[in-house]
Amino acid sequence: MENTKELERLIVASNNKNKLREFDAILGHLYSVVSMRDAGVDADIEENGVTFEENALIKAQYVMEKTGCAAIADDSGLEVDALNGAPGVYSARYCGRHGDDEANNDLLLENLKDVPAPRTGRYVAAIALVRPSKAPIVRRGTCDGEILFERRGQGGFGYDPLFQCETGETFAEVSMETKNAISHRKRGIVAVLEELSKEQA
């Protein structure tokens, strides 16, 4: 796969430190991963799409237009089957405030209190790569699991302490290496890279 010149510097359309760390861990050996703030874009981009894909595209497009450089963005969240896919695109602000992980987890537990195990669901990440003068690439990655009855683990962020993945551990218990090998974000990024590879073949 060609990964020189045009994509050597890749701006992540986020200032979320946790997401940036994951993007860098997954893509850092291929590209110089830069946050949008470090690229000179300091904005709170309005995510008004109704799907993960729309929101990811909105963010990547905004940063690409501001910088003229390739930008990658994700929009991710948790879909719980017993809640008809909620919290979904509202995962980060499920409790009504943006980014309050504790309150979001509390509300999720409350809304699932009468639901027996297995409480199935999945993490979803839509990844959008937007480049000047080229068609955007948007792909989705998922990671199936179960929602536990109480938090486990000290790592991760978001709903990670309640999300038990295929290893039997929560995303807050697994190592960063394990999470980055199986996560929804990794799978979405790999799907984008595969499409990019086809385009450049």
Regions found by a protein language model. Name each.
Residues 2-11, 17-201:
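Anionic-ligand binding patches
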